[in-house]
Amino acid sequence: MSNTYIIVGAGIAGIAAAEAIRKIDSQRPVIMFTAEHNLPYSRPMLTKTPFYSFDPDKWTIHSLEWFDANRIDLHMDEPVSAVDPSSKTVTSSRGVYHYDKLILATGAENFLPPITGIDSDMVFTIRRAEDIFDLKKVCRASAKAVVIGGGVIGLETAVELWRYGAGVTVLEAAPYLMTRQIDEEISGLIQKKLQGQIDVYTGVSIKAVEAPSAADSACVVLSDGRSFPCDLVIVACG
């Protein structure tokens, strides 16, 4: 197939690239790959919607009919594992595809700080819709959750967990919450608003996440010796 555009990634950047291509070129084939099962959706909504009614289909960027009308061949649930610039091909879980122009729009993965036990099965990050479904499997209404990170994503996640019925503790290394977005005075107002709902500890250093097995409770241990038993840990450190 000649003069083919391939876009790897179907987030906001990938969709914007497809839209831009179609504004200047309505004829050449466009193939888009996503590893996710869903139609492309607004990723920021992952932490802005109640867990109990979570449904990524409510925030799709474009319908399947839009992709068809714009002749964009959307390959869902088909991760790309390799790119060969010399042969101008990409290899996915289902085959090898030739491209003339390639756009990589995969975004970044979550940062996991170098903490002992951070790779435990009881530690979660939120990057994809599937992550929320995985969380819901273990987060019963009476669960205890520790959120590592007091930025926007961490606090949004903490609030939704609390609304879901979980007991939530937020641990933040910085001296106050949301240091990249607001000053200490405004942060103090937010922390005051959370009092009685979510426990917040700032200026802390995490030593380890102790999680012997999925059948046992986890425990987040600070460098000063304090510990926080929990059923799950969510890392929201960027």
List the predicted regions and their residue ranges.
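Beta1-alpha1 glycine-rich phosphate/pyrophosphate-binding loop at the start
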Residues: 2-73, 160-182
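Short, glycine/charged-enriched secondary-structure capping and boundary segments
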Residues: 21-23, 45-48, 89-90, 116-120, ...
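Glycine-rich Rossmann-fold phosphate-binding loop(s) that bind the pyrophosphate
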Residues: 9-13, 127, 148-151
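FAD-binding core/adjacent interface of flavoenzyme oxidoreductases
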Residues: 1-6, 60-146, 203-209, 219-237
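Rossmann-like dinucleotide-binding cores of NAD(P)H-dependent redox enzymes
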Residues: 144, 153-208
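Hydrophobic alpha-helical segments typical of transmembrane helices
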Residues: 17, 45, 62-63, 76, ...
